[in-house]
Every structure is written in structure tokens, then in C-alpha cells.
């Protein structure tokens, strides 16, 4: 039924569903829509964005048994769900200073609690100022739970044994504790007195449908009550955001758009952001799915319409959309005099996200404005510097920029690519490119790379140092008396390696460790407590320069000691620390500044 303009007071809220992989967000949406979306998706994971409208009469019908607990008379037309594979597509629901989404459902496996992607989603929701509630999914997996298909949670919980209720409460309070650590007050929804200060937790089972009625009733009631000003219907020209750019058979290049304000009509002039500049074009066709039908499953059921009111998920066909930018704002231009204002507004928004500086930082490329913004934000939280952040495939310029950085800061001389490829024919010149299609995973890959490079550099530097060591020539274990001397020794403290120079207790150099052996097997090192045979090369003879029972030290250069103490303090063992103090006493006889100011 079409609602007349005079009857329109509130638009439908835009609801985004987020959650960790396999926590059940697609299954939950499937249950809400009453379709079999999951079964039509390869690998049971959402492959592309969709938008589904759930009309008010469906919500009221489902929530009928809850009217005593959640009394609602709906004035909103329904709920518009954005089906998102993780927060990658939610990122494109961007709006200056916030998000197009009015409210979010964070789906959490109640048996596992908050996972990495859940926490990352919460951080983005907080940044975009989007209120959310928790769908604590998979209650059917609770030991002893008796499933009751498609009934409200409050009805189902009454049918459970006391020990099962206690078990559920413990799982809920585990979530409450995790959310408290992130700075949020939360509680099971039926125990909340003030929803403005407390995140609601709704126990559900996407598999059996238990709790879905509670979830929908709460969503509709909360948005209608607390977001009324935001939901007020506006009659003016449409404002929206591009979710995805596609090439559709028979339609050419199209854009999937969420209209969050105003009215969009066929033949309207629209202005939007493109990869290489502003695009101004005319709407050739508007297509919408039927209620309870997912946009991405309705390629053959798309209905062409002449106009659409906010909020709605629509497909727009128009000329010159090949370079349209996902995540860009889109505006209807009724008056040519406003073109320049909209153009400037869009350009400023894009400029805020695209970055370039001459610092040593990583090169970041993404497929859309929204994902680029989310990645930049996540990297800034991690303290990872960014030299260049841009949209589109990896170009020769990106490789050159990464090469410049690699010469000075090897750990940052990389290109991180989110859903973009390398342009053909470009030589990467040995520059590492990290690809990933999950935001939090790409961030983890970047962190791992930086850490691996630093650790390798640390090992290289550390391995070139002459480390403190103290040995004793064992009496009765002289195998060769002259150059090279071969003797049995015990390592009293620290470490010795081949090529380490040795000094006596009076500071005189006696030679260099040539080889270390244990039972005729060559060793790279010997540490405290080990008894091994070593050969010493140099002008040395047992009985003349050194004697059985003598104590020798490694001759640690001043610079090596400073690097060891300042850069690698965690590598200094207790026995090595004592050896350092003894070496400092010996070396200061010749150099009073040796080891001065070091915190041993």
C-alpha cells in the first residue's frame, strides 16, 4: 500500500547488522526475512551487499505476544535492513560526522562472547556515533536448552529448567563484563530501565527463531521513541550514499544506493563522487525490490519505479557511472545554482579521506571511500603511519612512493591493498604488497609485517654484537698448547661465539675464538654452565700467555655494550649482567668512560 505524502511522518529506520564471522548475522537476517538467502550464497557467507525492507505489519504480527512487555504502536513504515558482510560495507554507509545507519544489531555468538571482529565493529560504531544493541545468538546451543520454534525469548525462557536459566545468565554477564571493559553499560533487555544509557542484550536463536520477535519489537520501539527527530520525513530532493558500483546485464553500470532523506525521481539530475572527479548525470531508471525480498537476490524481480521516498535501498541506472565511487554521497540537484555547492561538499568529503604526506609510512589502497576511511581510522588507532591513502588499483606511483619509504624505513615500505589489484605491466620492484578482503585481517597482516621486519633487523643487529661472556680454562683439558690453542673450558656466565675476541683479567688481549665443539660437533654458541672445547687463534701459548685454570672474558667494544644495554635489555640474563659489571671494571683501567651512564 502506497502511503500518501500527507500521511508520511516518519521514515523507516536504516538498520545495519554486524558481527564476527560465523556468529550468525546472515542466518538471523534470513530468519527475519523468511527467505533462504543463506542457501543461495556460496560457502554460506554473504557475498555482496543487500537491503531488505520489513514492513510494520510484519513486526506487529511477530511482536503480538510481547505487547505487555513491549507495548508498541508503530508509526514508522517498517525497518530497512542493510545486509553487510562484516563492517566492510557498513563503512560505505558513511555520512559526514557519522553514518547513514540509524541503529545497528551486533550479532554475537553467546557461547563465545565478543571476538576480534565484534570489537572492531564496536569501535567503528562508536566512531560513527551509531547506537547498537546486541543479538546474543545461538541460545539453542546452551546445554539443556529446549528449543521452541519462532516464539519470543521471554516466552521460551519460562519453559527452561532453572539450571539452564542460570547458565544463560552467566553467559549474558560474561558479555556484560566484556562490554564494560570497552566502556559500555549493558544488560538483558527485559531488565533495563533506561535504554539511553544501557546497551540492550537480546538472547536469540537465528536457527529456531526464538527471540527474533523481541529483537524486531525492540528495534522498532527504540528507534521510533529515541530517534524521532532523525527519522522525520523530508519532502525535498534526495540525499543518499553509494553502497556499491556494479555492471548489470541489460542496464550497464549501475549504483546501489541507500536514500536516507528526501525523494528520488526518474529523470532527476544527480551529483556524486567519482574516482577521477565529480560526476553529474541524469537518472535513467530506479529499481527496487519487493518487501521481504533481498536486493541482491532479486535481479529478475526488480521493479522499475518512477520515484522513491527515504529510507530505501535502490538501484540507479544512469550514464557515466563507470567511475562512480562507493562510499560517496549522492545528491539530487533541483536547481543548477546549487551544483557548485554540492560539488565542493563532495570534494571536501573525499579530500578528508584521501591522504598524502612525505612521512615514512605505508601506502594504502582501497576500493571505496568508506573502506579507505575505516582502514585509515584503524591504522591511526594502531599508531601506524600512512604516507598515501587512496582509492583505485595499485599504480606505478604507489610503487615509487613505497620504494622511497623502503630505503629509509624498511618496515613501512609496503603497499596494503583492500579489494584492489595491481595495474597490468607494473614492475613492483621487490615491494611487498599485502592483499586482504577483511579490514581487521588486513590490519593484522600489516602489524605482523612491521613486527617481522623489525625483529629480523633486530636479529641482524643483535647477531653482529660481541656479547659479554666469561670462561674458565679447565685444568687437565689442554689438547693443543700453541696457536691455535685447543682447550676445554667452562662458561661461567654470558655467552661465547666463534670470532669473539678474548681478554685476560688484566685487560690484555689473548686471541680470538676460532671454533667451539662438543663431542666433535661444531656449535654456534656456548652459554652458562656448558663445558666445551674451543680453539683460540692468536699469539698465544699455554704456560706462557695463559695457564690452566685462568679466567678469560670476551672483549666487548664500548659501542656494542651500549647497543646491548639500550636496545636489547630483555636479552640480558642475570649471569650476563654480572659479567658486564666485571668487564666494565676491567676495561675502565684503560678507558674511564667505558660503560659510563649505562643502567645495568
UniProtKB/Swiss-Prot annotation:
Q: Which domain of life is it from?
A: Archaea
Name the InterPro entries on file.
Answer: EFTu-like_2 (IPR004161), EFTU-type (IPR029459), P-loop_NTPase (IPR027417), Small_GTP-bd (IPR005225), T_Tr_GTP-bd_dom (IPR000795), TF_aIF-2_arc (IPR004544), TIF_IF2 (IPR015760), TIF_IF2_dom3 (IPR023115)
**Region labeled G2 — which residues?**
44-48
Q: Where is this region: G5?
A: 205-207
Region described as G3: 83-86
- Which positions does UniProt annotate for GTP binding? 19-26, 83-87, 137-140
A GO CC term assigned to this protein in UniProt? cytoplasm
Q: Which residues form the tr-type G domain?
A: 10-227
Keywords of this entry: GTP-binding, Initiation factor, Nucleotide-binding, Protein biosynthesis
Molecular-function GO terms, alphabetical: GTP binding; GTPase activity; translation initiation factor activity
Start and end residues of each stretch annotated as G4: 137-140
- Renumbered residue ranges of the record's region G1: 19-26
One Gene Ontology term of the biological-process aspect is: translational initiation
Its function, per the record, reads: Function in general translation initiation by promoting the binding of the formylmethionine-tRNA to ribosomes. Seems to function along with eIF-2.
Q: Which family does it belong to?
A: Belongs to the TRAFAC class translation factor GTPase superfamily. Classic translation factor GTPase family. IF-2 subfamily.
- Listed name of the protein: Probable translation initiation factor IF-2
Species of origin: Saccharolobus solfataricus (strain ATCC 35092 / DSM 1617 / JCM 11322 / P2)
Amino acid at each position: 500500500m502506497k502511503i500518501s505524502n500527507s500521511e508520511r511522518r516518519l521514515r523507516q529506520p536504516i538498520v545495519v547488522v554486524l558481527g564476527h564471522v560465523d556468529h550468525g548475522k546472515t542466518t538471523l537476517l534470513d530468519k527475519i526475512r523468511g527467505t533462504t538467502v543463506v542457501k543461495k550464497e556460496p560457502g554460506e557467507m554473504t557475498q555482496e551487499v543487500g537491503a531488505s525492507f520489513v514492513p510494520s505489519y510484519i513486526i506487529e504480527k511477530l511482536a503480538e505476544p510481547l505487547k505487555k512487555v513491549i507495548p508498541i504502536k508503530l508509526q514508522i513504515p517498517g525497518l530497512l535492513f542493510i545486509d553487510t558482510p562484516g563492517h566492510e560495507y557498513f563503512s560505505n554507509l558513511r555520512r559526514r560526522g557519522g553514518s547513514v545507519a540509524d541503529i545497528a544489531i551486533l550479532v554475537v555468538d553467546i557461547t563465545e562472547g565478543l571476538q576480534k571482529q565484534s570489537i572492531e565493529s564496536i569501535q567503528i560504531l562508536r566512531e560513527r556515533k551509531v547506537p547498537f544493541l546486541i543479538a546474543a545468538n545461538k541460545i539453542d546451543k546452551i546445554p539443556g536448552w529446549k528449543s521452541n520454534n519462532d516464539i519470543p525469548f521471554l516466552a521460551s525462557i519460562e519453559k527452561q529448567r532453572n539450571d539452564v536459566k542460570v547458565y544463560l545468565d552467566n553467559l549474558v554477564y560474561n558479555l556484560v563484563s566484556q562490554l564494560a571493559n570497552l566502556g559500555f553499560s549493558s544488560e538483558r533487555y527485559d531488565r533495563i530501565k533506561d535504554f539511553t544509557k544501557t546497551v540492550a542484550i537480546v538472547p536469540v536463536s537465528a536457527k529456531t527463531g526464538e527471540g527474533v520477535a523481541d529483537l524486531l519489537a525492540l528495534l522498532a520501539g527504540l528507534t521510533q521513541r529515541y530517534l524521532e527527530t532523525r527519522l522525520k520525513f523530508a519532502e525535498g530532493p534526495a540525499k543518499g550514499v553509494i553502497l556499491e558500483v556494479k555492471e548489470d546485464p541489460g542496464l550497464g553500470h549501475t549504483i546501489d544506493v541507500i536514500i536516507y532523506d528526501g525523494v528520488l525521481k526518474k529523470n532527476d539530475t544527480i551529483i556524486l563522487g567519482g574516482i577521477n572527479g565529480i560526476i553529474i548525470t541524469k537518472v535513467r531508471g530506479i529499481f527496487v525490490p519487493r518487501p521481504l525480498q533481498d536486493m541482491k537476490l532479486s535481479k529478475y524481480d526488480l521493479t522499475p519505479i518512477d520515484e522513491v521516498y527515504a529510507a530505501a535501498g535502490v538501484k540507479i541506472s544512469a550514464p557515466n557511472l563507470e567511475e562512480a565511487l562507493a562510499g560517496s554521497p549522492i545528491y539530487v540537484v533541483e536547481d543548477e545554482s546549487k551544483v557548485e555547492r554540492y560539488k565542493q561538499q563532495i570534494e571536501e568529503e573525499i579530500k578528508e579521506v584521501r591522504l598524502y604526506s612525505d612521512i615514512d609510512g605505508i601506502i594504502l589502497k582501497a576500493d571505496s571511500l568508506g573502506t579507505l576511511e575505516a582502514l585509515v581510522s584503524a591504522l591511526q588507532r594502531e599508531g601506524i603511519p600512512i604516507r598515501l591513502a587512496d582509492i583505485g588499483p595499485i599504480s606505478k606511483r604507489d610503487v615509487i612512493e613505497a620504494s622511497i619509504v623502503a630505503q629509509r624505513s624498511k618496515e613501512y615500505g609496503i603497499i596494503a591493498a583492500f579489494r584492489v589489484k595491481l595495474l597490468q605491466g607494473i614492475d613492483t620492484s621487490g615491494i611487498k604488497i599485502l592483499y586482504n578482503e577483511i579490514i581487521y585481517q588486513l590490519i593484522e597482516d600489516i602489524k605482523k609485517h612491521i613486527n617481522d621486519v623489525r625483529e629480523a633487523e633486530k636479529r641482524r643487529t643483535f647477531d653482529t654484537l660481541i656479547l659479554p661472556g666469561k670462561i674458565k680454562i679447565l685444568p687437565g683439558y689442554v689438547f693443543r698448547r700453541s696457536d691455535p690453542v685447543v682447550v676445554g673450558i667452562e662458561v661461567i656466565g654470558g655467552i661465547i661465539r666463534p670470532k669473539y675476541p678474548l681478554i685476560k683479567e688484566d685487560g690484555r688481549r689473548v686471541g680470538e675464538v676460532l671454533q667451539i665443539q662438543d663431542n666433535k660437533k661444531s656449535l654456534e654458541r656456548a652459554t652458562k654452565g656448558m663445558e666445551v672445547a674451543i680453539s683460540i687463534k692468536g699469539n698465544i701459548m699455554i704456560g706462557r700467555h695463559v695457564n690452566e685454570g685462568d679466567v678469560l672474558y670476551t672483549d666487548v667494544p664500548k659501542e656494542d655494550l651500549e647497543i646491548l644495554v639500550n636496545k636489547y635489555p630483555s636479552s640480558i640474563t642475570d649471569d650476563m649482567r654480572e659479567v658486564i659489571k666485571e668487564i666494565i671494571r676491567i676495561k675502565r683501567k684503560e678507558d674511564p668512560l667505558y660503560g659510563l651512564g649505562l643502567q645495568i
